[in-house]
Amino acid sequence: MKQYKDFCRHVLEHGEKKGDRTGTGTISTFGYQMRFNLREGFPMLTTKKLHFKSIAHELLWFLKGDTNVRYLQENGVRIWNEWADENGELGPVYGSQWRSWRGADGETIDQISRLIEDIKTNPNSRRLIVSAWNVGEIDKMALPPCHCLFQFYVSDGKLSCQLYQRSADVFLGVPFNIASYALLTMIIAHVTGLEPGEFIHTFGDVHIYQNHIEQVNLQLERDVRPLPQLRFARKVDSIFNFAFEDFIIEDYDPHPHIKGAVSV
């Protein structure tokens, strides 16, 4: 995708060397935005092959409200293993905040169910927001949320989503995040009777780890190929009833996968 290649170039050209929590070292800059028209194809990177199975199962795991890696491991997804404790627990991470946000009074709030109902009944609302940044529980999380807040917007029968991501690993994380939130937008559009609009990705700290620079430059040398298409295998009435088999990716022809070490 041209947007992603432009993003990589921006960080390489305008970023500065900066230390980080992991000790790896980064080239970092602050503030950026990409936009993807979901009617033009499913925004899954073509300059390297992505593992759609991991993207889809992680999103389904979030939507279940699950915070144990067992479900992911049972489905061949290992992307959270480094942060889990000996029992597979991660603390109150994304799934917990999305589905059972704990307020100061002890009440739990299912933000996803509330969001779906609000989109259906009050599509002009400017409060179609889900937050994973629960300040009172940050210290209990194995990893505080990087993609921490998203908002939906309904216009002319189309559903758009804007994500704010406080911390963005350009090489490993961002390609997954783009595809994940594009998929989330499409499935919410599906269950609310809307068409997909745009996915807008807004960033805080964007960084390329020092041990990913070679891989990023390799991607910049590769040509951008046509985007794949995503369709659903069946009509699904509830967002919580989706299964991996419901997602069909067509015409995905990426360049080969590029490996990169995860900084924990």
Curated annotation (Swiss-Prot):
Protein name according to UniProt: Thymidylate synthase 2
EC nos: 2.1.1.45
Function as written in the Swiss-Prot or TrEMBL entry: Catalyzes the reductive methylation of 2'-deoxyuridine-5'-monophosphate (dUMP) to 2'-deoxythymidine-5'-monophosphate (dTMP) while utilizing 5,10-methylenetetrahydrofolate (mTHF) as the methyl donor and reductant in the reaction, yielding dihydrofolate (DHF) as a by-product. This enzymatic reaction provides an intracellular de novo source of dTMP, an essential precursor for DNA biosynthesis.
Active-site feature positions: 146 (nucleophile)
Temperature dependence: Thermolabile. Inactive at 46 degrees Celsius.
Quaternary assembly: Homodimer.
Entries under PROSITE patterns matching the protein: THYMIDYLATE_SYNTHASE
Catalysed reaction, written as an equation: dUMP + (6R)-5,10-methylene-5,6,7,8-tetrahydrofolate = 7,8-dihydrofolate + dTMP
Gene Ontology BP, a term: methylation
Subcellular location as annotated: Cytoplasm
Note: B.subtilis strain 168 possesses two thymidylate synthases, a major form ThyA and a minor form ThyB.
Result, substituting residue 7 to L: In strain: ATCC 6633
Similarity comment text for this entry: Belongs to the thymidylate synthase family. Bacterial-type ThyA subfamily.
InterPro entries: Thymidate_synth/dCMP_Mease (IPR045097), Thymidate_synth/dCMP_Mease_dom (IPR023451), Thymidate_synth/dCMP_Mease_sf (IPR036926), Thymidylate_synthase (IPR000398), Thymidylate_synthase_AS (IPR020940)
Effect of residue 224 to L: In strain: ATCC 6633
Principal place of residence: cytoplasm
Keyword terms: Cytoplasm, Methyltransferase, Nucleotide biosynthesis, Transferase
Pfam family, one: Thymidylat_synt
Annotated effect of mutating residue 187 to M: In strain: ATCC 6633
Pathway connected to this protein: Pyrimidine metabolism; dTTP biosynthesis
